[in-house]
Amino acid sequence: MDCYTANWNPLGDSAFYRKYELYSMDWDLKEELRDCLVAAAPYGGPIALLRNPWRKEKAASVRPVLDIYSASGMPLASLLWKSGPVVSLGWSAEEELLCVQEDGAVLVYGLHGDFRRHFSMGNEVLQNRVLDARIFHTEFGSGVAILTGAHRFTLSANVGDLKLRRMPEVPGLQSAPSCWTVLCQDRVAHILLAVGPDLYLLDHAACSAVTPPGLAPGVSSFLQMAVSFTYRHLALFTDTGYIWMGTASLKEKLCEFNCNIRAPPKQMVWCSRPRSKERAVVVAWERRLMVVGDAPESIQFVLDEDSYLVPELDGVRIFSRSTHEFLHEVPAASEEIFKIASMAPGALLLEAQKEYEKESQKADEYLREIQELGQLTQAVQQCIEAAGHEHQPDMQKSLLRAASFGKCFLDRFPPDSFVHMCQDLRVLNAVRDYHIGIPLTYSQYKQLTIQVLLDRLVLRRLYPLAIQICEYLRLPEVQGVSRILAHWACYKVQQKDVSDEDVARAINQKLGDTPGVSYSDIAARAYGCGRTELAIKLLEYEPRSGEQVPLLLKMKRSKLALSKAIESGDTDLVFTVLLHLKNELNRGDFFMTLRNQPMALSLYRQFCKHQELETLKDLYNQDDNHQELGSFHIRASYAAEERIEGRVAALQTAADAFYKAKNEFAAKATEDQMRLLRLQRRLEDELGGQFLDLSLHDTVTTLILGGHNKRAEQLARDFRIPDKRLWWLKLTALADLEDWEELEKFSKSKKSPIGYLPFVEICMKQHNKYEAKKYASRVGPEQKVKALLLVGDVAQAADVAIEHRNEAELSLVLSHCTGATDGATADKIQRARAQAQKK
């Protein structure tokens, strides 16, 4: 353990700092870092280098090359820079490289050097040029702030939703500030800048002069400033060699340190961690690195070569041509276990486990000491926590073995923390591998989340590793393997050196029916890459027609989209395609397409019936569908025409169509309707009243109700209304009028073709039993019983039923007998039944 703490450096009495190597860089740089624009993404992100050929002391002879590397120095991309002079580079939270040019244009590149998009910081910037720029991160996303040649600031807090803000002018500012940075306070981005001995804070509304509390006297200039990773703290380097550290609000001073160096540093960044004991700032010069905090002494390191500092959530990454290191405050659990002569529970447990492996009795002594103090649970937790903060797998294993050893002597220690730490460390060790090059710490990993880490592996096209992690952690398929495979497929369609057939087959073999994977999304990506045929092949694997059709329409494959919509059976989908086709094709081609798709044609006809009647007529004409054309003209005659002449003309057209369709019945019926309309018009002119649009029967009934019996009879003869129907019409009309005398005359005019039972029924319906009895006696024998029962003459009905010896009639009469009034009649029927059975 003594050897293990050899690289620990105390800062004051409360904290230790250590620096260890992450990778030995093998990136074969052709330029010194000082000659390059450098950008390194946080959370173990990639490194971008662009040799600066626009420096005045080094005239450019060739175009510069933009190189992108992993944190381990593995090359990811290299491209010849063909655009304008670049002022600054920076990485967004999505690991997109932002290149801020002198003309105010910001070019956005992917991790593999693929151009994504560009945007401008405004016309004023274009006119005045960019002097300096900062890329910063907020809870809203990644932002860009620039300083123009007119010494004005412009910023956007989120490049994904670009909204430019021109900051207020600084009074009397005639030259570029000596240093400046972006502060994020209360969800608002501010600019803090130094002009000589003065500090100014710019927000969207005003420019305010600010003074750091407790600043040492004699300051004539601020040479460097740094804001912490979380934007909570600020450090200022003055020309007197003092470093002031305080809150970012400039309301509270934390400490001040005199480094006795007045030369401006190359970089200054914060080095702290969550729940840090000692907040510290790391300052770098050409060959010196200094860690300062609230202590009279500092920690100093010699830099053998040009180095670059990358602030992280819990420390600072330092890389040069040959190495990549991590400097951080030793976590509390590690300090408790490993510091010299530590008697912490975790330290004793680690020693106990080592002695146990040696089969030494000291293991029992250490263990008993921990148990006697009641600190075994704390010891296990310390070892688990410390294992998470260790970078070397061997030390992780030692600590986890100690934790596992201690757990054996605890009855109810929850296993979740141990299991999760083992899983997390296995994931971290996998991504820290040199060939992967993502040197995440445990704290960074927890802040980043597993989903974001998987996204970053996908971004690096490390699909197998991402899938292995998903399977190892048993993530739900939709969040894990399915999502990774979908990304892989979207990348696969961009490989233009492979045939469409092979790509489609490979994707289907790999994905199959994996839940959560949308073939339509993959096909859309293929179409976006200009591979239309591949997109169509991929859509064949998409089971949801609702996802197939919109993309097919977008690809101008409307006829195929129509076929797919019809196959789905979704009428709404078919209508969507039809309306698209209607707007896309000329009228003739559209109708021809419909003729080849009967279902679509039928649906379109239904649509036209409600929306486009003239189009419907054209469809019938084109198909020579005279039957439907006749029906169309009949509907049109009533829907569109109010004049009787126009209506008759439309009906005549319909009759002609029916004759062409060889439907003589429909043609004759239409001609009869024309005659009826003309007659109704004449009746209205001669008799008054409302006759138009009545049916033939209603017309006859209306005439009878109006007392025009002769005209009604003449109408019946003209239209060959059968006698039975005419008698029913007249019977009903006279009963409605309650003209019983005329009804009796009508019944005696000749023998009724409908019999006399209807007369009985109609009279009873009008509650006139007296009139009903008149007709009951005239009812024929086969309906006599029913008529007598209708008028309530149960006794006579019984006599008739007995006389007819009809069992059904006897049962009918018996069902109408009531015990109080018809008892004798019921007995009479029962005796008749008994006599009939004896015979």
Swiss-Prot record:
Name the predominant localization: membrane
Top-rank lineage group of the source organism: Eukaryota
Q: Which UniProt keywords apply?
A: Autophagy, Cytoplasmic vesicle, Disease variant, Dystonia, Endosome, Lysosome, Membrane, Nitration, Protein transport, Transport
Tissue distribution: Ubiquitous.
Provide the GO MF annotations for this entry. actin binding; actin filament binding
> Which residue pairs form cystines in this protein?
none
- Give residues where 3'-nitrotyrosine occurs: 4
Q: Which GO terms describe its biological process?
A: autophagosome maturation; endosomal transport; endosomal vesicle fusion; endosome to lysosome transport; intracellular protein transport; regulation of SNARE complex assembly; vacuole fusion, non-autophagic
The record's subcellular locations are:
Late endosome membrane; Lysosome membrane; Early endosome; Cytoplasmic vesicle, Clathrin-coated vesicle
Region Interaction with VPS33A: what ranges?
A: 642-736
Tell me what happens on changing residue 725 to E.
Disrupts interaction with VPS33A, no effect on interaction with VPS18 and impairs endosome-lysosome fusion
Q: Which InterPro entries match?
A: VPS16 (IPR016534), Vps16_C (IPR006925), Vps16_C_sf (IPR038132), Vps16_N (IPR006926)
Stated membrane topology is: Peripheral membrane protein
Which GO terms of the cellular component aspect does the record hold? autophagosome; axon; clathrin-coated vesicle; CORVET complex; early endosome; endosome; endosome membrane; HOPS complex
Its function, per the record, reads: Plays a role in vesicle-mediated protein trafficking to lysosomal compartments including the endocytic membrane transport and autophagic pathways. Believed to act as a core component of the putative HOPS and CORVET endosomal tethering complexes which are proposed to be involved in the Rab5-to-Rab7 endosome conversion probably implicating MON1A/B, and via binding SNAREs and SNARE complexes to mediate tethering and docking events during SNARE-mediated membrane fusion.
The record's comment on protein family reads: Belongs to the VPS16 family.
Quaternary structure, from the entry: Core component of at least two putative endosomal tethering complexes, the homotypic fusion and vacuole protein sorting (HOPS) complex and the class C core vacuole/endosome tethering (CORVET) complex. Their common core is composed of the class C Vps proteins VPS11, VPS16, VPS18 and VPS33A, which in HOPS further associates with VPS39 and VPS41 and in CORVET with VPS8 and TGFBRAP1. Interacts with RAB5C. Interacts with STX17, MON1B. Associates with adapter protein complex 3 (AP-3) and clathrin:AP-3 complexes.
Disease annotated for this entry: Dystonia 30: A form of dystonia, a disorder defined by the presence of sustained involuntary muscle contraction, often leading to abnormal postures. DYT30 is characterized by early onset and predominantly cervical, bulbar, orofacial, and upper limb involvement. Some patients have a more complex phenotype with neurocognitive impairment, including mild intellectual disability or psychiatric manifestations. Loss of ambulation is observed in some cases. DYT30 inheritance is autosomal dominant with incomplete penetrance.
What is the official name of this protein in its record?
A: Vacuolar protein sorting-associated protein 16 homolog
Its lineage opens with: Eukaryota, Metazoa, Chordata, Craniata, Vertebrata
